[in-house]
């Protein structure tokens, strides 16, 4: 049975809040703690983007996505493609928080034989829709899925969500997918663009300026909505809720989501050096203390 999960509490035996926004914030804190712990244990990974995307993923899995907890391949589920696969620690921790994988499995991030690799691999983990790797591929995959779903024999209202980083907008493949989706008016496609303005070696606007992103997407036939604070659950839930009705407009939707890389850890926030640098034991301890772990 499909559901939008709002009642999964498998990390801390604490009575959950009732308010919808508080619920997302509750899960977000737990997810961040797991990200810090798993990256410190692995000794490698991408903390900044992972921490910045937590609220986006929490809103999707605890409010928006339709999925069947008993069947990851349910043919009525919504689809999520994570094009910026290096941020997968956030996805893995969210899957654990939602009760879809065992939280103990998070300890094995990037280990030989683990299902939780440095980029999501669908052949290992059934809750994934695609395998990621080179940046720029995910939106093309998502657009193909959305196009296929629209042409199924039976009527359906399934949606495809694709998380894309602003850094990978350097890739030409992204813009081919943007034009394709606009041409075919794929109203069942939502692109969530993680605008955190960092890449491995610096700021996005210094490495490859992207210009007026909203205008570029609109010019290709997309609806565009700006999310000024992509770590604010209220703003995210409002934007994602509005996306539910966007199919009446017959255009794909781009949510330009301005997140804080390293969110929740003061010494990591907005610092591009943490794009691909893991935390050592002392740094992890400081980060966890800021997240309320004593």
Give residue ranges: language-model regions.
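Glycine/aspartate-rich loop-and-adjacent alpha/beta segment that forms the canonical ThDP
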Residues: 233, 237-294
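Thiamine diphosphate
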Residues: 127, 131-247
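N-terminal capping segment at the start of a domain
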Residues: 28-44, 194-196
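Short, positively charged and aromatic/hydrophobic N-terminal segments
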Residues: 6-10
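Cofactor-binding active-site loop characterized by glycine-rich and histidine/acidic residues
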Residues: 35-38, 50-183
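Glycine-rich beta-alpha junction loops
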Residues: 55, 86-87, 196-197, 258-262
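N-terminal hydrophobic or amphipathic helices/low-complexity stretches enriched
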Residues: 12-31
């Amino acid at each position: 049975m499909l559901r939008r999960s709002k009642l999964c509490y498998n990390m801390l035996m604490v009575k959950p809040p009732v308010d919808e926004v508080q619920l997302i914030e509750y899960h977000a804190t737990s997810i961040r703690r797991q990200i810090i712990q798993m990256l410190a244990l692995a000794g490698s990974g991408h903390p900044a983007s992972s921490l910045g995307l937590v609220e986006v993923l929490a809103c999707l899995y605890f409010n928006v996505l339709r999925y069947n907890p008993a069947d990851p391949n349910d043919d009525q589920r919504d689809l999520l493609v994570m094009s910026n696969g290096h941020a997968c620690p956030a996805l893995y921790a969210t899957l654990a928080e939602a009760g879809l994988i065992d939280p103990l499995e998070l300890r094995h991030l990037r280990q030989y034989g683990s299902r939780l690799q440095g980029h999501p691999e669908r052949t290992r983990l059934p809750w994934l829709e695609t395998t990621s790797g080179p940046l720029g591929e995910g939106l093309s995959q998502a657009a193909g899925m959305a196009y296929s779903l629209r042409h199924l024999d039976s009527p359906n209202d399934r949606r495809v969500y694709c998380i894309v980083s602003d850094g990978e907008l350097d890739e030409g493949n992204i813009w081919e997918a943007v034009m394709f989706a606009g041409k075919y008016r794929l109203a069942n496609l939502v692109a969530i663009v993680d605008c955190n303005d960092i890449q491995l070696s610096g700021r996005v606007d210094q490495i490859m300026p992207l210009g007026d992103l909203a205008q570029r997407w609109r010019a290709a036939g997309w609806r565009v909505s700006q999310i000024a604070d992509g770590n604010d659950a209220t703003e995210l839930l409002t934007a994602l809720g509005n996306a539910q009705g966007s199919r009446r407009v017959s255009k794909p939707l781009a949510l330009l989501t301005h997140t804080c890389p390293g969110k929740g850890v003061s010494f990591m926030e907005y610092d591009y050096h943490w794009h691909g640098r893991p935390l050592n034991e002392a740094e992890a301890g400081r980060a966890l203390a800021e997240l309320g772990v004593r």
